[in-house]
Structure formats: C-alpha cells, structure tokens
UniProtKB/Swiss-Prot annotation:
This is 33 kDa chaperonin. Under oxidizing conditions two disulfide bonds are formed involving the reactive cysteines. Under reducing conditions zinc is bound to the reactive cysteines and the protein is inactive. It holds the Pfam family HSP33. It comes from the Bacteria. The gene is hslO. Its main location: cytoplasm. GO terms for molecular function: protein folding chaperone; unfolded protein binding. It is found in: Cytoplasm. Signal peptide: none annotated. Redox regulated molecular chaperone. Protects both thermally unfolding and oxidatively damaged proteins from irreversible aggregation. Plays an important role in the bacterial defense system toward oxidative stress. It comes from Bacillus pumilus (strain SAFR-032). SUPFAM superfamilies: Hsp33 domain, HSP33 redox switch-like.
Length: 291
C-alpha cells in the first residue's frame, strides 16, 4: 500500500516528507497507457504533487502544471491534504532511449524552456498561484527551484520512477527535505553531503525501503514521524458532473448531439474514464433546461 510520512529532524529545524507511490503511478500508467519516459515524467510530477499536498490542511488542494516545450506536452497533476492525487500528460506515448546516465530521458520529453506553475485552493476567494521557470526538465530539480524561489523555503526534492519491460511501474516515490529558519550551518553541510551521495530514490524503493527508512537514509538520523497518510490515485469525476457540463452547452447543442450521433461520449482527462449518454438521457438533460 502506498503512503507518505511527514516528519521533523534535527531538533525540529528540518521538515521532511517521503512517499512510496508505486501502486499510484502504476494506476496512472494503466489508465493512460503511458510509455516509459512519459510514465517517469508523470510519475515524478504526481509524486512531488502528493507530497506538496501533504503540506496543506483539511479540504485544501493544489494543481501543478508543467509545460517545458518538449514532445510530451503539458503534465497536469492534482493533489490534496488527504494523499489523493491524479494526473495526466498531453502525449502519453512518448519514449526515448536512456540518457548518458542510463536513466529514462525525462528532460528530453519534458523540455527545458517553459514553466512550472502551482495553483493552491486554500478555501479563500482567490487562489494562491506561483510560477517558476523550468530549470532542468528532470522534474525534481524543477520542484526544488519552485519551492526555493516561489515559496522561499530552502528545499531539496528527490523523485524517481523505475519502469518494468512490460511498461508497468517497478518502483516510484520521492522525498522533500526543507530547512526551517535557524538551521545551523553544520546541519546544512551534513544534509548537503548526504544528498550528494545517496542512491537514486527509485533504487531505494526498489530495494524495499519504507518512506521512514528513506528519510533516515537521507537525513542521517532517525526522524520524528508526525503523521502517516495513505496515498492513492483518486479522481472525483462523475457522470453527474459531465451531465451538468452538457446542460451548460445549451439546448441547441444537445439537439445536435441527438440528431447527429444519437448519443454523447465524455472522457475525463485525469482518469480516462468514459461516460456515455444515451439519446434518452440527452433528451432528459434537454428537458431540464426547458423546465
């Protein structure tokens, strides 16, 4: 079962998150039929998004959009404080040979000229929006840059995905380490040293390490676990929502659907679920407009 942990370390001066998202990203791959490089891109993005969601409270939620100008197009992910995340990519069938480091070439797929934007719905009239430039296209570095530049929190983000030969997901997960005000230089140096020498996060998960063990490996000390949150691919789309969307198109548009196709199909971008509206159902929706 996928889950994430929130923790503190170094006498409360370091805030940390770690997640195993293997099943969640596997579900995204199954729904969107992504090829390996696209799976790595969407998997890294969804993993970072669900950890950023853990920084929120209650019913608050966020949307991340990455547009780097590469062949994959846009990557969109939604997350919330409950460990629920969903996501999709404009062009799921994108794959390249491994890069010079023997890893999936996410940078080539994502591109390096564009933006990472975050919109947070924290229950106020206006949403919080932050945007930074893509700095590497590798996703983890781009989230690090966003947190440092837009939210002014010194951070390190590590996210990774390993893909099986049959395109299913072997391992996926990540961590976010954040320095709180007043962190001593010695602690910062120690963390920088550890971050530069640890194995890729996806390898740690493949080895069977838990989020708690990953944080201990990254931090160099046993953290104080504050909360454990289950993580899952979750989409809140429904036939009722799409029905309301069809009603909003107006009577003439619904008449066209009935006359030309005798039915209507609506597909959710986020989960690929398809909803079919029969002629009778469309007529009922049309009736609702004229009531």
């Amino acid at each position: 079962m996928d889950y994430l942990v929130k923790a503190l370390a170094y006498d409360g001066k370091v805030r940390a998150y770690a997640a195993n998202t293997t099943d969640t990203i596997n579900e995204a791959q199954r729904r969107h039929h992504t090829w390996p490089t696209a799976s790595a891109a969407i998997g890294r993005t969804m993993t970072a998004t669900v950890m950023m969601g853990a920084m929120l409270k209650g019913e608050n939620k966020l949307t991340v959009k990455i547009e780097g100008g590469g062949p994959i197009g846009a990557i969109i992910a939604d997350g919330n404080a409950k460990g629920q995340v969903r996501g999709y990519v404009s062009n799921p069938q994108v794959h390249f040979d491994l890069n010079e480091h023997g890893k999936l070439d996410v940078r080539r797929a994502v591109g390096t000229s564009g933006t990472l934007s975050v919109v947070k719905d924290i229950g106020l009239k206006d949403h919080f929006t932050g945007q930074t430039e893509i700095v590497s296209g590798e996703i983890g570095d781009d989230f690090t840059y966003y947190l440092v530049s837009s939210e002014q929190v010194p951070s390190s983000v590590g996210v990774g995905v390993l893909v099986n030969p049959d395109n299913s997901i072997l391992a996926a997960g990540g961590f976010i380490i954040q320095l709180l005000p007043g962190t001593e230089d010695a602690v910062i140096e120690r963390l920088e040293k550890r971050l530069s020498t640890i194995e890729p996060i996806s390898k740690l998960i493949e080895k069977g390490m838990t989020p708690e063990e990953i944080l201990e490996e990254v931090l160099g000390e046993k953290p104080q676990i504050l909360e454990t949150v289950p993580v899952e691919f979750s989409c809140n789309c429904s036939k009722e929502r799409f029905a309301n969307g069809i009603i909003s198109l107006g009577k003439a548009e619904i008449d066209d659907m009935i006359e030309q196709d005798g039915q209507a199909e609506a597909q959710c971008h986020f989960c690929n679920e398809t909803y079919v509206f029969t002629k009778e159902e469309l007529e009922e929706l049309r009736e609702e407009i004229t009531r």
